[in-house]
Amino acid sequence: MSRIIIKNIPRYYDKEKLSTYLKSLPQLDAEITDVSVAKTKEGVSRRFAFIGFKNEEDADKAIRYLNKSYVETSRIEVHRALDYRSANEKLRPYSKYASKNIELKLQKKEKEEELRNLEEEKAKKKKDANLKRKFLDTLDPKAREFLKLSSSISNSRSWENEEVFDTEITNPVIPADEDDDEYQDLPAAKRHEGDSIKSTEHDSTLDSGVVIDGREKSSSELHEEESEQAAEGDTAKNSGTDAQAPLSDDEWLRLHRTRIKEKQPEEEVSVVGDELKSFDKENNDEHLERVTNDKIADASMLQKAENNVSEQERNIQLISETKRLFLRNLTYSCAEDDLKSLFGPFGQLEQVHMPIDKKTNNPKGFAYIDFHDADDAVRAYLELDAKPFQGRLLHVLPAKARSSILLDDYALSKLPLKKQRELKRKNTAASSTFSWNSLYMNADAVVTSLASRLGVKKTDILDPTSSDSAVKQALTETHVIQETKNFFEEHGVDLDAFKNAARSDNVLLVKNFPYGTSAEELTSLFSPFGELGRILIPPAGTIAIIEFLNAPDCRQAFSKLAYTRIKSSILYLEKAPRDVFTTSFKQSGKPELAQKVNAVEATTSEKVGTEDIESLDTATIYVKNLNFSTKQEEFQKVFKPLEGYLSAVIRAKPDPKRPGKYLSMGFGFVEFKDKASAVAAMHAMNGFVLDGHKLEIKLSHQGVDAAAEVRKQDSSKPKGTKILIKNLPFEATKKDVQSLLGAYGQLRSVRVPKKFDRSARGFAFAEFVTAREAANAMRALKNTHLLGRHLVLQYASNATMDDMQHAIEKMAKEANAEAAAPSITGKRLIETD
């Protein structure tokens, strides 16, 4: 866990102030990747913070140093932060600021939504009632009476309508001059009868649900009518008049009022006859609509429950389809190798793409991971989402599939066969694992280069009428390759790295371009894809090494320029071996060009062979007793001010516990321009204290030690004067082998085993007079091609040659015996006789 939590910090400490405080601590020398101070919704500090570090060692160091220390007057507590998922599963809310359970939040949200729907429904009903009232106010009495008489029989009982109609029409009035005592009980009975009639009218109206515009009268309207009639009855009783008085126009209107539909134009009110036809249908459909709405609501709830798939399941489904992950919240110092080491254990990776900001040349904080298998991508998502990585919580999401511009099979079939092969080869170039010989060169460019520097024609070097043209071509290539090796070594290229299978993401080997191609032309060809570092072109001008500052730019250039035409040739691109440069590139704003065109010179190996390696002066000092925590930048910073300083490096070894990481070995080397500067630096810096360690410095004998190591390794091998040449072309003759190897020493014997048809078997043996001559031939011809085949040379022991000879003799005897024996049919005939 590279993330820690600091509790009880001062309340007024924010992110900037806490970062400044941590960076000001000299003992806390570590890269801080994230600082997060917890706050409430109101912006008040909760007095704890999360701090992220680049690795776990720095986090442990910070815990040991900061725990139970004081930040101003507050004593802080520091320990490892819990994992995001573990914190949500194990911890319960302990303060009013803590988040509540997700289920409670969902329940609360559903209740609020139900209340909001009820309020909206009430408001709508109220609005409909107001619209109905306004509609009735616009009708004249005859229209209202017509609507009353034209109401559907199914919505009201006919006898009730008659009773109401009779009651409304015949309203007997008691004479005022009659004696009240004679009719003492009659008016009361009539009043009760009238009241009962009115009550029956109201009940029938309520039961029948008279519909004028497709809606029933609401209970509130009926209650309002009853209240008005009761008030009128009381008034009549108090005034001494009979309660069965005729209804006024307003009273009759209120009894028959209705509501219009929402958004119904007022000009359509007069067209009453057409609307009456749809009253019954609308009234009957209202109940059906309510039932249907209930069923739809139940179905929607069921559908909602079925579609209630969690976000994680949706992400897993998308990842299974695309096999691609999107990462965010990465540190700006994160590299693609860090992501490869993190996601590599889950399965085979197709691509790791981290976009780079062109202005700052730093990552943008997000990346894409392509897996070969969808199950591996899903497993990586489940394991690493919300997990700390370099001090930050890694956020993993499904990514969209990469856009492909490949043509389908039908479109490809319409193209010529040559064009089809070119497109397929170009599209598979980036993912292809095939590679040529690392120092492969165009044969025509090799001969043209040598002829140009010698000032002769190519026909003078390769005579078409000569039988040894292939040997001359091989010797020319050998010379150019040896010259190229020396040039690369002078410019900080580690030739031993070409033996490694791991490939670099930002360095390309550019091959097969014509002779005469300049560094400026290659720069203009590759620079549009990104910022370039070093560009190395050897004197022969047949191969180049181009370094990009950013890996994404290098990948883009590789995919766009592979197998493209350059002048009269096809450009071959190959990823260079990892760590091909011994020193890192110092960015200076423009690419560093290294191009050298010289006359033909003797190779360095030939010069060194005639000199004693121990007589060479050294300009390198050996520094030991370094602190294991001392970084490369600090080590270089100490020696950089010295006169004649060139470079400084701390030796490191791979960390077995952390793939992709390195551990300091406690010593290093500093290189100067000359021996005098190295001696002066040794006397000046010997005993200097760096990170608490006293440095011990002396002159380095690295060159002598390297030569001794080479001699030791060579002595452990079965050395001798005999060489075995493998992968020999079948067209090669004994004379070709003699001409090729004779250029490096005096040959004692050459033997090319042949088949029964007198053709070569694909290998040969050569014996030199001295072991030095054999070693020179081995070293020079290691990357040579003869008739298009890469020669493989190794020392041949006597046992190897004896075994080969014994195998050849055995095969010859078997062949002779088979030729002398009779046929199988003949044997069977003799035996039967």
Curated annotation (Swiss-Prot):
Broad class of the protein's primary localization: nucleus
One GO-annotated biological process of the protein: rRNA processing
InterPro entries: Mrd1_RRM3 (IPR034482), Nucleotide-bd_a/b_plait_sf (IPR012677), RBD_domain_sf (IPR035979), RRM_dom (IPR000504), RRM_MRD1_RNA_proc_ribogen (IPR051945)
Keyword Glycosyltransferase (UniProt): no
Positions of the RRM domain: 2-83, 323-401, 506-578, 619-702, 721-798
One GO molecular-function entry: RNA binding
Keywords carried by this UniProt record: Nucleus, Repeat, Ribonucleoprotein, RNA-binding, rRNA processing
Keyword Nucleus: yes
Localization terms from the record: Nucleus
Highest taxon listed in the record's lineage: Eukaryota
Region: Disordered, residue numbers: 160-251
Compositionally biased spans, kind Basic and acidic residues: 188-205, 213-222
A cellular-component GO term for this protein: nucleolus
Signal peptide (from-to): none
Function noted in UniProt: Involved in pre-rRNA processing.
PANTHER family per UniProt: RNA-BINDING MOTIF PROTEIN 14B (PTHR48039), RNA-BINDING PROTEIN 28 (PTHR48039:SF5)
Family: Belongs to the RRM MRD1 family.
Protein name (database record): Multiple RNA-binding domain-containing protein 1
Organism encoding this protein: Schizosaccharomyces pombe (strain 972 / ATCC 24843) (Fission yeast)
Source lineage: Eukaryota, Fungi, Dikarya, Ascomycota, Taphrinomycotina
